[in-house]
Amino acid sequence: MAYPFQLGLQDATSPIMEELTNFHDHTLMIVFLISSLVLYIISLMLTTKLTHTSTMDAQEVETIWTILPAVILILIALPSLRILYMMDEINNPVLTVKTMGHQWYWSYEYTDYEDLCFDSYMVPTNDLKPGELRLLEVDNRVVLPMELPIRMLISSEDVLHSWAVPSLGLKTDAIPGRLNQATVTSNRPGLFYGQCSEICGSNHSFMPIVLEMVPLKYFENWSASMI
């Protein structure tokens, strides 16, 4: 989860988020090199007194500044497209969870189980227990098994919402009348926090998401107790 004054991304907990973090670093390094080159050229222009007023064209330079940007864009586009396809792939999910956005709470349905569904509301500040996070804690957490591919089906009952958990690299729009899907795979157990990431009304900031990733044995015990 995020912490105060954090400048970087949250710690990656899923393979997709690891890829996104690497892509972010890769792109940032390219931007840094280009910015350094531009600043260096500007500093030369401001400090040198040498000019070439008689130069009418320079085909070699024009060729370089046409080809080089194209190569840079390809170096950015290829890993980006690869990650986009990875995010769309869902290979043999062991579990499917249907997520519905409402004003202003989430409802979850485990479609592989009969009558395993619940609503998830934010816990008011006055009801928080010691150690719980303000505006991020919910009354019913989404419990899922770790290290297994899980399919999330996401939609909305009223207006546009967005189901997002940054540490897992997830952000999927919840659109009325449309069913979007995403893959959840966690590399380790723990609590992972998110929020609605699409402005949906006056209580938009009071729609937290809490995923509790646990070993498969604990998930089976939890699901049996909920049915």
From Swiss-Prot:
Co-factor(s): Cu cation
Membrane-protein topology: Multi-pass membrane protein
Stated name of the protein: Cytochrome c oxidase subunit 2
Catalytic function, reaction form: 4 Fe(II)-[cytochrome c] + O2 + 8 H(+)(in) = 4 Fe(III)-[cytochrome c] + 2 H2O + 4 H(+)(out)
Keyword set, alphabetical order: Copper, Electron transport, Magnesium, Membrane, Metal-binding, Mitochondrion, Mitochondrion inner membrane, Phosphoprotein, Respiratory chain, Translocase, Transmembrane, Transmembrane helix, Transport
Membrane spanning stretches: 15-45, 60-87
Primary location group: mitochondrion
UniProt subunit comment: Component of the cytochrome c oxidase (complex IV, CIV), a multisubunit enzyme composed of 14 subunits. The complex is composed of a catalytic core of 3 subunits MT-CO1, MT-CO2 and MT-CO3, encoded in the mitochondrial DNA, and 11 supernumerary subunits COX4I, COX5A, COX5B, COX6A, COX6B, COX6C, COX7A, COX7B, COX7C, COX8 and NDUFA4, which are encoded in the nuclear genome.
All ranges on the Mitochondrial matrix side of the membrane: 46-59
Coiled coil: none
